[in-house]
Amino acid sequence: VVAQERSARTRQRLVHAAAVEIDENGYERATLTRICKYAQLSIGALTFHFNSKRDLADAVRADARALTNDRMKQVAHGHAPGLDCLIHLTGELAHLLETEVVVRSAARLERDCPGDGGWLESWLPAVRCLLREAQRSEELRPGVDPQVMTALAVHLVTGAETFARASAGGADPHLPAVATQLERMWEVVLRGAVATP
């Protein structure tokens, strides 16, 4: 049992180190040597747990999906389906991007190394479902296309990733948290920015 726990901790250290390396340098430029150095483990320990850099990236994605799924369940229990839940969900995604390197890394992997089971697919179906529910319950104005709103949500979360990565690197400390910025953007979108004549 002790050996299994130690093995699990070692594996988790490697996944975290891979997430840091991928977040900072991207998948292509990430090296197993730097991952081992950051984790303070040998290449032998890495190859015991993972056959390749791709396997490590898959483990990062899996951890990010698990964190995201847990957060989505929390949001779903606290809000009625529809736009309110959508706003809170995207805010929580932004918060995860800002605070969890494994999530930021998985988001970067979407661009660097697309594949099945990416981070986007862990939350995009919920966004689509919430927008269909918002349309059914007439929260959306007639003529508002849920697919366009889905694209907007994806763009907002993708933008949140950019700001989260910048803030992780020491961006302006006077800027509000990324989740707060995203919620303010939703307010502008939902209220409209144009004054009526």
Q: Each PLM stretch: what is its role?
A:
Residues G91-Q135, E139-L140, V148:
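Short secondary-structure transition hinges
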Residues F50, V60-R61:
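DNA major-groove recognition helix of helix-turn-helix
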